[in-house]
Amino acid sequence: MNSGEGGKDEMPPTSESAPAAPSAALSPGLLCVAEYANNTLAVADPATGEILQRIAAGQNPATALVADGWVYVGSSGGGEVTAVNIADPSQVTSITVGKQPLGLCYDGAQGILYVGDYFASSIHLVDAQLKSLVKTVKLSASGYHNRTDPPDCCRIDPGTGRRTVALALAPEGNLLYCANYGTFDVARVDLATGEEIEAFDGVVGPRQILVSADGAQLLLAGVGGEGEQQVSDLYVLDRSSGKRVQEVPVGQSVAGVAQASDGSAVWAIARDDGELVAFDADWNETGRLSLGVGIDTLVLAPDAKTLLVGNSIGGQVHVVDAPSLALLNTIEGLASPKDIAVIA
């Protein structure tokens, strides 16, 4: 597996033009795309395919999240989170956060943005109102069953820590689940005490973790590695015990997962097969759409009717009708899109 930091495939920088000064408010339905190779957040209209503006977003932005009137962008190469005001995108705040922020998760009840730090093996807590770091939780050096290293396929340097890449918050707000690339497990942080509790086994090359709509399970997508470390299934874990209760066939290198809020449908993408796959609530496959090898980001829009599928190699975001899997549009000309957030 040719992987860069945090399991993100490395891309050479591009010579895109400098971002224009942000202008109008970001309207509901617009896409905010983290352009890794351009150091920008691209704002795009999914209906027309037009890129409306680009906003400077730190070095190598790789994650994006919309929360409480702001777009948060994790700058994986610069140790900062960029916050863009949705009502006035000329208001941009840079928040210094650790070494390499990748996973982002927001707790609206507490007003806290959780930031997974890949190289520091830590979880940072950012006060969303103050736009400042207020606490850091350090993960233990060893993970599930005392793991300290990734498998050979995914190793850069031995013993470099847990390498958190994705986060999910328990619906009760008491636990944070952290999918780790280095020890291919799921760390659990008790948010009341700030302490890590027993980890769950995970997946090689994790990319995304979700709490299921009913709160009973964790959905874990991973791209795997080489040989026996290849992953072609979506892993479903019991949220109480961590036991893997189901392996759902998707295709080679499962790079993303999304679920309807009522649990009636689930979608996943197979990066190396280039397919978007749909399932019903009982995990019966209901359809496939071929979008091309390299698709590595999957997001369900707030309207619950539209899927956004990014291809960081091809520089595209595909707009797909969720119920029918019909391809509605493709946004071209993006500089290694790594994540997508949708304005609600």
Please report, for each region that a protein language model flagged, where it lies by residue.
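Predominantly soluble domains enriched in secretory-pathway, periplasmic, or organellar proteins
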Residues: 1-344
